[in-house]
């Protein structure tokens, strides 16, 4: 992990590669590097830390029109200059960048590379050294590349330079995202389209176990058997302005403010000309034919799934289970006879979720992906897709994708309810419109959120979020946002569980953020607040208008109670943002985190 770029053409490759890497910064990384074909061979530049440091060491006088680049998020070996990509073979003939994990790299070293002295701790160096070993047996570069890949077990997206064939880039993909971009007398390679929108909007999607030979005039796709594959390019539905901050200091703040527009966009996309919710009939029938829904997700998407369970069970009266993908893949529960799977992933590339999807596909079960990236791996491999229509989300901490997931899940639940003849009792599209209006109000109250962050979180070591019913799930997401970007030890708890152990953590001055948006548990959560105050906690109560009481810290505009999670999370996002600012943290690129987790 975490991002690859490549360029071959007539322009200066260095600047294109560096700008491409900068567009991949949102994915998270700890080091970066580029390699370029120069007059006297391949030149490698790499540094631990930010791309700005890498820029400082790149020689502007080196003329080159071919190169590859990489941002690394450490999986094998500590973050360091030595472990940063690109990696080279001993003779320096081959230079390689790689995303993914080679599971059998130690076995490959033992069987094929015992005489090689390795420079780094990475699994990636094994690939480039194996490439050189295969060529030494008399194979052509292409044959050696295919042989090398056939010996590897795991995931990879690879860009390879050959010093003896300077006018081409070799590319390969398996279980890790990679695109080839099409230009006029140039071509590019990228982990996602955003990296290369500066030069093209035409991309060719690569499938698993394919290799590509890229020159400035041609793109040749082959399978591992050497058979040529024809595939037309697609136009990326993005604009370069979509991935710029504009006047905002951070992408996260921009994306928080975009949430009302996202909700309105979702309403428009999922209703017919009469204003009625309309989903694909095939999705509806597949769910109606099932006897239980299983939601599979990670992180923020998992929290969205917990709320989605409430929507589906309350609206459509269908049983739902929600599972963390990384646990489900090796601890699968006993399934019902006719399960239906919903995979939630902002990027559509989450490796843990994909591992489960592969399993359930092999079992013959139908699956739906809810993702912000149609055409992503999960989208391609599932039977159905519901797009989020949220636009690119650049900040590592998810905000607008989360509320988009909630909106789409509510629409899905309402559609199934209607098909089953269940009475919803309210007009969902109208109520979602009111949610968007409430979001506008909340986004205009940044000064209040900043003040709360300063009062409760600027200097604290830890923080607890409590809630009952669906507020508990929103609290989990609030705690995740806070810990992600401010590095405060934050945890979410069910209010009723406090007395079963958690309350032992409360000490004098501990901030406790309590959510009170559900009428049927309002008195219960108020009692929990009294419990923690009695132990010295510093409470911050966020309530819904109509449920507020004297002493509440912030009152949310009223929306339909079922949709309260979509508005209750906005203050938590903003409080987390301002807490991170007060603590001088990197809001958009928090330490140790990657936006798209493409390895298990």
Swiss-Prot record:
Keyword Ligase included in the entry's annotation: no
This enzyme's EC code(s): 2.6.1.16
List of catalytic residues: 2 (nucleophile), 595 (for fru-6p isomerization activity)
Molecular-function GO term, any one: carbohydrate derivative binding
Catalytic reaction list: D-fructose 6-phosphate + L-glutamine = D-glucosamine 6-phosphate + L-glutamate
Chief location category: cytoplasm
Subcellular location: Cytoplasm
Disulfide cysteine pairs (residue numbers): none
UniProt name for this protein: Glutamine--fructose-6-phosphate aminotransferase [isomerizing]
Organism: Bacillus cereus (strain ATCC 10987 / NRS 248)
